[in-house]
């Protein structure tokens, strides 16, 4: 298996390190300033390929073919880029897609179902595409430095014409992003005694470019959405 890690401006997504560990340290970093992103991932990687290109299925497939690993299963972190890229890869390669997996190996994929209330086990008989849930497995450190290879993908002349042009990629809004992907969380609980206090807390979180998290008692009172809940429940 190979972990495919989308990189934007030198930043790898949440869950990149776990996904690389799930792939036994083998990773293909694709995007912009991948070498910079590797600085924070080198301790979990064994073999790394760096691809400076746009992040799309065609370039990932070209890179995998270039390194001679076209028959490998590809796994991605279940980050926004990973969730977007995985189905495109599955469609282009004609492979099964296992989304939201909690454990991945060559012969068994366990996928969370029904909001985490059940687990479905699959036994793939061919190469597949999968996304690994963020924060589910932890990381394993490698003692040796990784082997790093830069992969140059030459542009092809038969690229399909399109009327859609990407002008820019805007960063996520910390106040609305999923808590599992938030780099910084400002939390509050029953000690804040009214809904107005949580409006203030949200304003503080926004000012600090952070996400607001609350305890279950607060969501039960209706002072914040259940998507903002933190803690073991």
Predicted feature descriptions by range:
Residues 1-233:
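N-terminal glycine-rich FAD/FM-binding segment characteristic of electron-transfer flavoproteins
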């Amino acid at each position: 298996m190979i972990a495919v890690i989308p990189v934007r401006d030198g930043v790898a997504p949440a869950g990149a390190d776990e996904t690389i560990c799930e792939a036994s340290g083998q990773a293909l970093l694709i995007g912009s300033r991948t070498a910079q992103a590797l600085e924070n991932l080198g301790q979990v990687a064994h073999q790394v390929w760096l691809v400076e290109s746009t992040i799309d299925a065609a370039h990932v497939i070209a890179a995998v073919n270039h390194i001679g690993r076209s028959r490998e299963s590809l796994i991605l972190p279940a980050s926004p880029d990973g969730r977007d890229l995985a189905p495109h890869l599955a469609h282009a390669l004609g492979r099964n897609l296992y989304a939201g997996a909690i454990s991945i190996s060559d012969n068994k994929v366990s996928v969370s179902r029904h909001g985490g209330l059940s687990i479905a086990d699959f036994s793939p008989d061919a190469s597949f595409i999968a996304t690994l849930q963020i924060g589910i497995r932890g990381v394993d450190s490698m003692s040796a430095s990784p082997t790093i290879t830069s992969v140059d993908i030459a542009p092809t002349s038969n690229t399909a014409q399109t009327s859609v042009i990407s002008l820019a990629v805007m960063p996520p809004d910390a106040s609305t992003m999923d808590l599992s992907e938030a780099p910084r969380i400002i939390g509050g609980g029953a000690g804040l005694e009214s809904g107005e206090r949580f409006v203030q807390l949200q304003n503080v979180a926004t000012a600090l470019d952070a996400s607001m998290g609350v305890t279950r008692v607060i969501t039960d009172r209706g002072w914040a959405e259940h998507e903002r809940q933190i803690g073991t429940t």
